[in-house]
Amino acid sequence: IKQNKLAFFSLIMIILIILCAVFANVICRYNPYTQSLKDRLLAPSFAHPLGTDELGRDTLTRIIFGARISLTIGLIPTLISMFIGTILGLVAGYFGGKIDFIIMRFADIMLAFPSLLLAMVVMYTMGGGLINIFIALSLVNWASTSRVVRSETLSLSKKEYVEAAKSMGVNNATIIFRHVLPNCIPTLVVLFTLSIPSAILSESSLSFLGVGAQPPTASWGLMVVSAKKYLFTQPVLVLAPAIAIMIVVLAFNFLGDGLRDILDPYLKER
């Protein structure tokens, strides 16, 4: 990955962001939830590099703690949705027939609706909160993974080593998890990396629309919506979390593109 400078730089950036999120309690000297009305809407200074919000909370501290929320929401729902999509894609591609038809038609229905709209419906039904965000994003994002894995499985099922395993009487589960799934991993790695930004943006959008993270959670999307009325008087309150979202999303996208370029020769050879 060092040969792709942009992807390597993005990887370093992601590692630094993760370290900041993990050690936020050590790095930050302020509590992200402690209010101080006498310090509200302070301009950037040495004590508060990005100023303070309308409740006197340090903006930089809330952005660092907000990285925990964004990365967690980027990783956990993506892992869950990819697990669901991978299992369904493997089953549909390997067995075919009516099973394939039912799973893929259900996936088509899910893909026919905007994922953000479906997530909003789920959130309105279950209510706000981080756990419900995990559930909503996991339920609406599995379909694209299932289609990709199904396509890979259809191709791999025709390989000689798979046909040989079938002729030797190896059971289907062993063939799927020993011969088919391992060869899908390079594609899944790239797909996973490129899916994380989508989940982060979805969480930010849901929070911005008022159905995602709830106050006083230090969420980047929630910080943007809380500070939008100060856009012209205290623009850093809006720009800081917006730029944080942009940096993380771009870093994961560039890393995903780099991994795709690295793994592309392997995928073509396979």
Map each language-model feature to its residues.
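Transmembrane alpha-helix boundary and packing residues in multipass membrane permease domains
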Residues: 17, 90, 119-124, 133, ...
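Gly/Trp-centered helix-boundary motif
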Residues: 1-86, 90-91, 97-98, 112, ...
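Amphipathic cytosolic juxtamembrane alpha-helices at the membrane-cytosol interface
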Residues: 57-72, 76, 96-104, 154-158, ...
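Short helix-capping/hinge motifs at transmembrane helix termini and TM-loop junctions
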Residues: 24-32, 93-97, 122-128, 140, ...
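Generic hydrophobic transmembrane alpha-helix motif, especially the helices
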Residues: 49, 53, 59, 83-85, ...
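Glycine-rich helix-loop "coupling/hinge" segments at transmembrane-helix boundaries
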Residues: 123-125, 137, 152-153, 201-244, ...
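Hydrophobic core positions of alpha-helical segments in small-molecule transporters
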Residues: 9-13, 73-77, 103-106, 119, ...
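Residue-level recognition of pore/gate-forming positions within transmembrane alpha-helices
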Residues: 17-18, 82, 108, 124, ...
